[in-house]
Amino acid sequence: MSKGKVLLVLYEGGKHAEEQEKLLGCIENELGIRNFIEEQGYELVTTIDKDPEPTSTVDRELKDAEIVITTPFFPAYISRNRIAEAPNLKLCVTAGVGSDHVDLEAANERKITVTEVTGSNVVSVAEHVMATILVLIRNYNGGHQQAINGEWDIAGVAKNEYDLEDKIISTVGAGRIGYRVLERLVAFNPKKLLYYDYQELPAEAINRLNEASKLFNGRGDIVQRVEKLEDMVAQSDVVTINCPLHKDSRGLFNKKLISHMKDGAYLVNTARGAICVAEDVAEAVKSGKLAGYGGDVWDKQPAPKDHPWRTMDNKDHVGNAMTVHISGTSLDAQKRYAQGVKNILNSYFSKKFDYRPQDIIVQNGSYATRAYGQKK
């Protein structure tokens, strides 16, 4: 008889899982933790069937589960209703970063611990942010389409192509990912790096960026915190979103806020899709208010085939730099968050509950972080 049930919800790898054994984040490879869990005397149940609620396999198996593990890339939404139907549930683990798919208020009410593997994919996401910015501002899509279509119209590409140098670039959120984006942007000699966050960056972190810019670019004091979001986006050539999804950030980038942005600015979102209002963003790209929008996160995942971000574009057909949700799930990141999940489970199974403080989102009925719009 097992001590309890662990429910693991991951995306299907299919033939790709057979071809690549490092693809730990798929259901076939189970984060590499099956043997570990079973050695602890627990049962591991895996599924890809997470929707619709309340008739999915997740709903059925969660009813008597003690632990649920899911991922931001293929999230099983642990809603208030699902929590209410799961009396044995004690621990929710996010294989990756970002636990907005869990109803944190309901988890607090039930004193369910919610954890994630903080830091496991921050570099991966920051690199994807940089790639997306460059795809948009350098009009990579326009040039690539000509290359594969047998065309050669230099002016048709160059008319929408710019450098990052001397641009004002900003981030909404300057935490582990946002700061790494700022670090990488210094190399492009920006005019200014702006950030909007509930707290100021440590002086040492700001000085490091300013000193690097002065050393390599001859331009110091480029980093500035802006306290009003409308003021920041109004002066930015590129805006990147690197903050968690919570009640105050949901729908933050809507028609009203976008109206404050520079005409022809670029918007990049690898945080959470629901931070942006999909229809408002698509319309801004179509009208040319935004020169382009890119990222990998969607307000519903998997995104429906008719999602407006799949087909949004501008008149030159170069305003869309969307991908599926891949920024934080490189093979290197998968190795890190798989190990992190194992470490969290080990803390739970040993009854030490000595989780890394930065991995705890809610515990013992209260928030352990301000990242989700809550104070300690």
Swiss-Prot record:
NCBIfam families: PRK07574.1. The gene is FDH1. PANTHER family: FORMATE DEHYDROGENASE 1 (PTHR42938:SF9). NAD(+) binds at residues 176-177, 197, 244-248, 270, 296, 325-328. Induction: Induced by formate. The keyword Cytoplasm applies. Catalyzes the NAD(+)-dependent oxidation of formate to carbon dioxide. Formate oxidation is the final step in the methanol oxidation pathway in methylotrophic microorganisms. Has a role in the detoxification of exogenous formate in non-methylotrophic organisms. It catalyses: formate + NAD(+) = CO2 + NADH. The keyword S-adenosyl-L-methionine does not apply. Pfam families: 2-Hacid_dh, 2-Hacid_dh_C. This is Formate dehydrogenase 1. It is found in: Cytoplasm. GO terms for molecular function: formate dehydrogenase (NAD+) activity; NAD binding; oxidoreductase activity, acting on the CH-OH group of donors, NAD or NADP as acceptor. Substrate binds at residues 97, 121. It is an enzyme of class 1 (oxidoreductase). Its EC number is 1.17.1.9. SUPFAM superfamilies: Formate/glycerate dehydrogenase catalytic domain-like, NAD(P)-binding Rossmann-fold domains. The record marks 272, 325 as: Important for catalytic activity. GO terms for cellular component: cytosol. Keywords: Cytoplasm, NAD, Oxidoreductase. Belongs to the D-isomer specific 2-hydroxyacid dehydrogenase family. FDH subfamily. Homodimer. GO terms for biological process: formate catabolic process.
